[in-house]
């Protein structure tokens, strides 16, 4: 039977000093011997998705202590990608994922915690905590802060739904008046919570449900709704159940690596494709799988993407539906239920929401609104928005008159009535991206599924933005933004501003954009990221010249530079001949701190999850 990890610092006379310090934190005599549960919170006043999390750790702690544990909370950093977007701050976003993973590991291992609750929400925080949880492999439950309500405003006598991207597009569109732009800006992000569409934060919080590590509703229940309180309380109770199963009953199925198995990673990717999740999820799932020592690669993602239909279409791919609508339609469990009926997921995998070590099938039987007979579950998924601006969690208790169980015309569809039989994400490959690249097909206009255009090359996001706004980019161009990968950026910036500005200039469906950087979950259009190998690692994207023809064929999963192999060999030889100046941007002024240089030194390309190159660490 496994011994409590915390016994290392709480048992024996030689640990008198450690016990004295534990006592100074509030631990009582009769508490020693209880499991110590770490609560990794990520509260910050910088980020709307985290601004309401200050007291969430106390909620979870109360449930843990009531169930017989010792709860100890600490905090991680959290970067807001939207605020960091479009300037040097974005260089720090992806590297912050590794810092978060490391900080959770440091705190948990330094203090010998027995189990973990991760309170996350936004873009890099959930992935960083997920990497840490799988690295540590102690009982864990994830609970996020939840999505914000969709913005709403009246323009031209019509009520429209809004999100962050709408504010960005309006701000860059000269055809939108200053008054309308300001009105959209004021209305786009009305409450606390992660941005209201199927962007990276909400995508990742949904995927933790599919991985089996969070409770139903984690990805879709609004941050403002009173019902979300129960998710935090139940997370505390559930982690204690998992700890008891492992430490008292030697049940290894309570550990995250046995819950988030290869099958569960497949389930998560199937869900991702079906709901048209952010392309960043590919990066994070591959990274997390490596921490779990699971061989889950781009080849698996490519295989899955060819089999799974698009069952749930949400902003930014449509203005009609936001996360509040996904929740009304049954949330992640509603989508998984349809995927289960289509025979596309494994329902025999463990799940933290299952009682007594049960599986996903039992969870779906209770929480899929098309299966359940429980009126409390229907009530849970009827939780809706209040439309009142606030930074407070649990501030309202509004409900829809009914849930959306229309699988023919609703927010979530059955396989028969899918938005498309092609899924929402695809892996492309060809001489531009020998190791693959990612496109969010859910956001691509049908007329652009095949595209041939002339390369317009930029060696930084800043230059690309200037070129787009300055009129250099014209209809039919393929905008190439390179040296923005994990190593070359460094930090693999998101390219939301270039894609947004293409839309604002009426070029959103008339141009393509490819990059070794990545895209915000708010991106739509023919935007292809994660090109691997990246330019700084000798990728072909570094050899593209202005005017080269690039052919993109999403149905055939192909991206090809129409230049002869002989010419490419000549260009590669010339690049190699530059020595230390080769495979670097020709003209780019960018300050790179020592912290970012340290990240770049070990960073792998996107197809490996942009994680540290372990071969350099393991000799």
From Swiss-Prot:
**One biological process GO term for this chain?**
L-valine biosynthetic process
The active site consists of 520
What pathway does the annotation place this protein in?
Amino-acid biosynthesis; L-isoleucine biosynthesis; L-isoleucine from 2-oxobutanoate: step 3/4; Amino-acid biosynthesis; L-valine biosynthesis; L-valine from pyruvate: step 3/4
Which cellular components does GO assign to this protein?
cytosol
* The reaction(s) this protein catalyses: (2R)-2,3-dihydroxy-3-methylbutanoate = 3-methyl-2-oxobutanoate + H2O; (2R,3R)-2,3-dihydroxy-3-methylpentanoate = (S)-3-methyl-2-oxopentanoate + H2O
- Which SUPFAM superfamilies does the UniProt entry name for this protein? IlvD/EDD N-terminal domain-like (SSF143975), LeuD/IlvD-like (SSF52016)
Q: According to its UniProt record, which protein family does this protein belong to?
A: Belongs to the IlvD/Edd family.
Stated name of the protein: Dihydroxy-acid dehydratase
Record the organism. Shewanella frigidimarina (strain NCIMB 400)
